[in-house]
Design a protein with these regions (language model features):
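ER/Golgi luminal nucleotide-sugar-dependent glycosyltransferases, focusing on the catalytic module
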Residues: 1-201
Length: 201
């Protein structure tokens, strides 16, 4: 799954995928338990008014506070939806490449487990856990490798939740790793865009 700010950065993606046709490339950071702050993503039924997409908005500080409370066992706005399956929760990243068999499994699972789908309705950033949890509780969990997407997140409070713009300084890091795609590109760093476009022509 990609977006308009992603680019191919190396030739041979299709050939590489053919050579690993049964592998799902996805970043799985860790299993999430109720002792993790990240469990607030699904344990809280997040009020929609708190979902303001502004990194310095007061509501972001409220979200952070609620997450730390959740880690200590205090769950405000508890998610009272239930799901029947006994699943382990996992968190990772949004971008992944999966074989058709895995995608079919995900679609079939969601269709058969509407309660699991509904469980995430008022969650926070569910794209970081929804697919990861399904895959890691499936027979396909044994055939997983790290994502093929280069992403660098910011290090400041304002940027830590977002990929930062790729510049010429990232070129060496991208080429040194097993990356076929990269995110995110912006026109103000056109040199990096031109470099990779010319490279994969």
């Amino acid at each position: 799954l990609g977006s308009g700010q992603d680019l191919l950065v190396k030739k041979g993606l299709y050939e590489y995928l053919d050579s690993k046709h049964n592998i799902t490339f996805i970043r799985i950071n860790k299993r999430i338990t109720e002792n993790d702050r990240e469990s607030a993503r699904y344990r809280i039924s997040w009020p929609k008014k708190l979902m303001v997409r502004n990194d310095m908005h007061f509501y972001r500080f409220i979200r952070i506070f609620l997450q730390f409370l959740c880690k200590t066992g205090i769950v405000l706005f508890k998610n009272n939806r239930v799901y029947k399956d006994s699943l382990l929760f996992y968190e990772g990243r949004t971008w992944f490449i999966a074989p058709i068999a895995v995608m079919d499994y995900i679609v079939e699972y969601v269709n058969k487990h509407v309660d699991f789908y509904d469980y995430w309705e008022d969650s926070l950033a569910s794209d970081l856990m929804f697919f990861q949890t399904i895959i890691m509780n499936s027979p396909f969990r044994e055939k997983i490798e790290d994502e093929l997407m280069y992403v660098k997140f910011g290090k400041t409070f304002k940027t830590m939740n977002h990929p930062v713009t790729i510049t010429n300084k990232d070129v060496c890091l991208i080429e040194a790793g097993n990356f076929f795609c990269a995110r995110k590109f912006e026109l103000e760093e056109k040199e990096a865009i031109d470099y990779f476009i010319n490279k994969i022509k």
